[in-house]
């Protein structure tokens, strides 16, 4: 058998599929990140080792700002190419909805690099608007205001507009339009009004119900006519600058996008025919990320189109309908936050230990006085072959069930139960090995690989770092960052360190279908083993929660140039004291309470003075230490 090659690992984990030229494997068998075409590749294993020297322990979230920059440039260049091809005569505006990742360093990097690309921000709530107005200092870039609004929200936006911000208030419900009219009159400002339209078209994938008739937001055709009459009656006809639609996040099928664009373009035409000179069409989000690298519409974690195809369809549809009706091309706004941010963040954590189902030692023989069920099961294991495997499987299951029932009634002892378990799982393993080599294996054996997978316990919280994996079964690319020049010899599910049975990852990307285990390597006592989760830059940080009081992980920002990489910033993860403070425990008060208790225990002779000091020292140290396990 030939030696395992790096190309085999590339195929196994499909890194060339989902990696989008950013991720690969080097000659050392390490995962590398190439944020820029003119920059170096960052070896993730070497980066983790350097961070360890700097006392930055895993789990660590690694952000690559250069990837953010590249994503902005990619989207902008796609629009430029499409504009030239289809004779588009208006402007495109890339808008970043900060709900996707509101972390200040992320937003500031997007704003900084996006200035020359007409990049603006979208706020979907009052707190987000407060952030957006302050950080978006470029007076030429757009600010789009979505979400539910009250008077203070609208007043803030209108006053910011009065001072020079290009702010658009998008009406989600009819009562908002009335509030905008009222506040605009009080403040003596001509508002830039947008209207979100509820299309009949919907997206595809997990967020299909975000669009269509079941959509939470938007005005129906009847409500739109009511809104138009209201604006005309209030002298606000010229204030309607924008129409907006959104058919859902992560749209998997380009056909759904095309259908929505055709429907939305007719609203643009009809409004112009009614004398409403709309200038902007905001096509919302929906531009998907190919998480599994299969370019397939059948997978919720993939998409069957490229950014260029998405942009081509957007521009060509609106150009075509505008030219046919003799109206100006609209300025096109896109809100593709997921596509901008997903690739730039990588979560890295260490595998702490493993758990494997018991197995029978090949050299072990059973004692003559062993229980008859043990002897019978041993005989099945000893004579197992392909011809008898289905019958053997049925017999093994029956014997195991009988043994467990006898144990529950106190008839067989613990030693016998343990022997039954070891033999049963050894039989199961051998049957699975035979079945995997068959072209047509019995259906009963399909779930055995999942059942037999090891458990790799990892130093992270699924709920804090990968909430979508738990909440909506989102599948992210996951693989070891080292030893990729070696053939993986184990199959495992990943278990986090929360005290919750849901804290696990048991679905992984596969070129054939979803896999229920991850190919990994046996652990070495002398070498830490790291696993990385990729494409986690969208939504995961901001949606994460503190289940079991695990806080934010350490985060580092890594930039690259022609000579190498630089660790630009290290953001310490949350301490135990910080997360306790979130849930209204005063750390200082906790220490004082413990000091009183320890003093009392010393006086009562329960512990010595030195033991009391040691306990308090450990408590204080732990209180201001990392919430994750430390070596």
Where are these regions (language model features)?
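Short alpha-helical segments and helix-capping/turn motifs at coil-helix boundaries
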Residues: 7-9, 73-81, 104-109, 129-130, ...
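Charged, compositionally biased N-terminal leader segments and the immediate start
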Residues: 1-31
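Short, glycine-/Ser/Thr-/acidic-enriched flexible segments
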Residues: 30, 38, 67, 101-103, ...
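Flexible, glycine/charged-enriched surface loops at secondary-structure junctions
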Residues: 58, 62, 84-89, 274-278, ...
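Low-complexity, highly charged intrinsically disordered N-terminal segments
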Residues: 20, 25-102
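Active-site-proximal beta-alpha core segment in soluble small-molecule metabolic enzymes
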Residues: 87-280, 287-293, 304-309, 317, ...
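Charged (often Lys/Glu-rich) extended helix/loop segments that serve as interaction or gating elements
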Residues: 305, 313-315, 319-631
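A non-catalytic, amphipathic alpha-helix used as a structural packing/dimerization or gating element
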Residues: 66-74, 226, 263, 313
């Amino acid at each position: 058998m030939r030696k395992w090659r790096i190309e085999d690992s590339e195929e196994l984990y499909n890194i060339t599929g989902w990696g989008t030229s950013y991720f690969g494997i080097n000659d050392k068998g390490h995962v590398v990140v190439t944020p820029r075409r003119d920059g170096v590749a960052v070896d993730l294993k070497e980066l983790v080792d350097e961070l360890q020297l700097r006392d930055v322990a895993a789990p660590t979230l690694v952000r690559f700002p250069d990837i953010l920059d590249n994503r902005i440039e990619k989207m902008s260049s796609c629009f430029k190419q499409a504009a030239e091809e289809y004779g588009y005569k208006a402007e495109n505006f890339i808008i970043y909805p900060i709900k996707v990742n509101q972390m200040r360093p992320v937003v500031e990097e997007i704003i900084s690099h996006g200035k020359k690309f007409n990049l603006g921000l979208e706020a979907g709530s009052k707190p987000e608007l407060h952030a957006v107005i302050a950080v978006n200092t470029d007076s030429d870039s757009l600010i789009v205001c979505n979400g539910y609004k009250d008077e203070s929200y609208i007043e803030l936006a209108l006053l910011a507009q009065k001072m020079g911000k290009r702010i658009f208030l998008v009406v989600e419900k009819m009562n908002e339009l009335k509030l905008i009219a009222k506040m605009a009159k009080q403040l003596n400002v001509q508002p830039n009004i947008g209207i979100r339209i509820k299309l009949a078209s919907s997206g595809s994938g997990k967020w299909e119900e975000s669009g269509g008739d079941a959509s939470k937001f938007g005005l129906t055709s009847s409500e739109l006519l009511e809104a138009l009459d209201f604006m005309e009656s209030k002298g606000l006809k010229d204030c309607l600058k924008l129409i907006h639609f959104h058919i859902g996040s992560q749209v998997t099928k380009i056909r759904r996008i095309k259908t929505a664009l055709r429907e939305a373009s007719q609203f643009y035409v009809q409004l112009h025919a009614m004398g409403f000179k709309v200038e902007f069409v905001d096509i919302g989000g929906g531009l998907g990320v190919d998480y599994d690298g299969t370019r397939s519409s059948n997978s919720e974690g993939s998409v069957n189109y490229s950014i260029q195809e998405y942009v081509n369809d957007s521009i060509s549809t609106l150009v075509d309908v505008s030219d046919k009706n003799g109206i100006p091309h609209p300025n096109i706004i896109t809100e593709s936050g997921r596509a901008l941010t997903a690739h730039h963040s990588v979560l890295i954590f260490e595998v702490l230990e493993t758990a494997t189902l018991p197995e029978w030692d090949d050299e072990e023989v059973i004692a003559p006085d062993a229980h008859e069920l043990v002897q019978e099961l041993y005989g099945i294991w000893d004579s197992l072959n392909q011809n008898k495997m289905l019958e053997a499987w049925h017999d093994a299951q029956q014997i195991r069930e009988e043994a467990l029932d006898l144990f529950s009634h106190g008839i067989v002892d613990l030693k016998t139960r343990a022997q039954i378990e070891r033999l049963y799982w050894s039989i199961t393993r051998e049957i699975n090995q035979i079945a995997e080599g068959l072209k047509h294996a019995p259906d009963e054996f399909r779930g055995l690989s999942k059942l037999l997978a090891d458990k790799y316990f990892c130093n992270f919280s699924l709920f804090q770092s990968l909430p979508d994996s738990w909440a909506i079964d989102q599948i992210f690319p996951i693989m070891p960052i080292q030893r990729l020049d070696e053939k993986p010899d184990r199959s495992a599910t990943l278990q986090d360190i929360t005290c919750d049975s849901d804290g696990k990852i048991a679905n992984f990307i596969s070129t054939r279908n979803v896999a229920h285990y991850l190919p990994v390597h046996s652990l070495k006592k002398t070498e830490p083993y790291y696993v990385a989760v990729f494409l986690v830059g969208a939504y995961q940080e901001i949606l994460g929660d503190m289940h079991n009081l695990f806080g934010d992980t350490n985060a580092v920002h890594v930039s690259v140039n022609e000579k190498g990489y630089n660790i630009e910033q290290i953001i310490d993860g949350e301490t135990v004291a910080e997360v306790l403070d979130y849930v209204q425990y005063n750390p200082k008060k906790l220490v004082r309470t413990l000091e009183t208790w320890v003093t009392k225990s010393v006086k009562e002779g329960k512990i010595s003075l030195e033991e009391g000091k040691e306990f308090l020292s450990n408590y204080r140290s732990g209180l201001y230490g990392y919430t994750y396990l430390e070596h």
